């Protein structure tokens, strides 16, 4: 009578499998910690001032640059101060990226994937001005022109990438009070976001037009220093990340094919948990697919959006699977009907579906619009910033609540199994030894359980005459599920905060380390890889007879006793109860009678 590999695999083989997977997990952490740089880097660029010809102010193809042949003549701050109108409608703030280093021009690499720009504004008022304190949520109108050129292009070969007149709202504080003017420093504001870093050099021209009839920018005195922070993904991290994806992708595809083939060899339809496992493997395969290689050849500004969609699908599938995984082993219902997502889990999964749809809509509103206008950001208006912050906070709170609910479900599974263990003394020896490893002392606390798991996996389970201890194997797997869920939730919350920190607070420095990111990503693959192996149907018959001169007769009696109990348990799904895929689920559904 066959079951799953989890219950039929020998202790020696199980120990080797667990040790190998743990070694792979350690290697994933070391790969990010020892060889990968930080996931993201940034360059701070101080804007250069250039004076524009009035005749070409409306010519969007006219671009000013500060380095190279044909560069503009820079305007000093003293010249601006001496001008009676502060050169209103004539000044252009120029930012050229990346900056040179050691008298050598640097260029962006396509391995760096994306580019985000945030701006910090500093402006001042004359001390004689009546408007000494700027109002909060001060509206600033900016004429933005983003251009690019590649290696081999002439210094003046800039091509317009995007142009727009956008509004930004500033919150400023007094930074310096002098005898002639008062300076104000403002919070960082999002400026642009490029989903593909396809070109070698980028140029940004900023103009702050003044217009009396429309009251445009009249609340400002005069601009001082403008600082642009250009954030990019580190190319070295991208290479390590794609290397990890490239290595993991074929292994997951291979184990999925192997798992589904073993399921279809059985004379039954796949169970719900088996369907969920193959769906989870498919979502992970979609996430592992190294599509980023295409961005090294083609310009794909939608890659950020596509990456978010792929990760969102995986998160939704993983969260759904954990609820079903715990629920299928609770089995507290008495109805013999076949388990389905709609019949049993619609209440639990409705929150997951609503949360995923909300985040998808939020992402489309942000990065979907940026495909057409890279200067757009939902953070630019006070209302949009509050909505975006609300989404981030709710996402983090929801993730924490989900983890607590999952802990509660797994606790109920453990309690349910503990209640059913009271029936073990009434079972035959073969049936009892299949579920529980004989212990010298009771293991009731968590520390004892963890100690026993280690002992059972690496010392006792390899002995041929020892019991397989299905209950403790399952509990070990559930604890591994909790660890995986905890790290996933922590990574999700840190990712949301790291993504939004440049938009809502420049004083917060949150950046997940490369070791954490590669470790969690490897953990997802290793965890799902292990589930596909352990929950695959086994072709081994149970129980196995051990022949020796002293034990042959007793084993024959045990097997005969176990055979008489086959009517009490069903290791694999049957027509009457198709949701059971292992003897443990049968054990949690009914009490055996010896």
Swiss-Prot record:
Record's subunit section: Interacts with wg; in the Golgi. Interacts with Vps35, a component of the retromer complex; wls stability is regulated by Vps35.
Region (Disordered): 571-594
Gene Ontology CC entries for this record: cell projection; early endosome; endomembrane system; endoplasmic reticulum membrane; endosome membrane; extracellular exosome; Golgi apparatus; Golgi membrane
Topological domains, Lumenal: 35-239, 292-311, 366-390, 495-514
Tissue expression: Ubiquitously expressed in the wing imaginal disk, increased expression is observed in a stripe at the dorso-ventral boundary and other regions of the wing disk that express wg. Also expresses in the leg imaginal disk. During larval development, expression is seen in both motorneurons and muscle.
GO biological process, one term: compound eye morphogenesis
Keyword Membrane part of the UniProt annotation: yes
Protein name, as recorded: Protein wntless
Function: A segment polarity gene required for wingless (wg)-dependent patterning processes, acting in both wg-sending cells and wg-target cells. In non-neuronal cells wls directs wg secretion. The wls traffic loop encompasses the Golgi, the cell surface, an endocytic compartment and a retrograde route leading back to the Golgi, and involves clathrin-mediated endocytosis and the retromer complex (a conserved protein complex consisting of Vps35 and Vps26). In neuronal cells (the larval motorneuron NMJ), the wg signal moves across the synapse via the release of wls-containing exosome-like vesicles.
Protein topology in the membrane: Multi-pass membrane protein
Family to which this protein belongs: Belongs to the wntless family.
Listed transmembrane segments: 14-34, 240-260, 271-291, 312-332, 345-365, 391-411, 474-494, 515-535
Protein species of origin: Drosophila melanogaster
Cytoplasmic side: 1-13, 261-270, 333-344, 412-473, 536-594
Entry-listed glycosylation sites: 58
Main location: membrane
Residue spans of biased composition, Polar residues class: 573-588
GO molecular function list: Wnt-protein binding
InterPro entries: WLS-like_TM, WLS_GOLD, Wntless
